[in-house]
């Protein structure tokens, strides 16, 4: 039997979540967005825990195209504890039977959709969230996790080093590009209303920036683009001036955080999900380059404007640390090493 290339990461997830899985023993979960980056890590860690702990649990995954998912993730597709339910998140027919937990992981960030069809972005987020909440009511679910985004805070002020959950910023509604952030804000409000009106125990995970196996390399994620360039032996291209700050949570830690927030988060509570160690975009690019020999050159498209404060997109994770005991256990250097190794092994 071929060893799972994510075995070390999945053991890491299990080590930090072992007591939680008893809540899912013999239960059924329903997951939307299961084919995206968050979703594949949720499913990988679910299947791993299910096998090792003998949970006899089942995850039913909503997808528009089961065949495409099977082609991309054949191991998950064939796993006996994972089933697929075909449909669009905005209008899917409700699967039969009872479900104890629902994870609404659609819709992930898509710069292309947000730019080219912001109305579709808003509709997918808002209609999909209401449809999934209605299903949670109908199927008897007791817990509901929404994966939201740090985009709900709008632009982070440059003098605010880390954004806390009670920061009341917002996207700029005069910009069509705010569709994603505003859609997620409304999705969170739907969750609040359903939680209060129907006594559904809802928790919200506001994601920031991530790195790890299965992160798209050709999307709008800068770190993914840098990895793509370096893996191809090309110069690493930075489209801007390289000064904005980000922080990166590794995918295995992300899975720990999501399961913990679903199963132990306080109902009605929002939790930032990310790392606090800020690094500039140029710093990220140079860290990626340093992982290769010879190191590819790093090209910065624009010169920074003197005296202009650097943009930031960095969360405070104090709430998750103090209430749930969560940490960013795997630092950026090790995260890059594991991500590069996984991508190289895929193409060997």
Walk through the language-model features, giving the residues of each.
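C-terminal substrate-binding subdomain of Rossmann-fold SDR/epimerase-dehydratase oxidoreductases
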Residues: 5, 83, 164, 209, ...
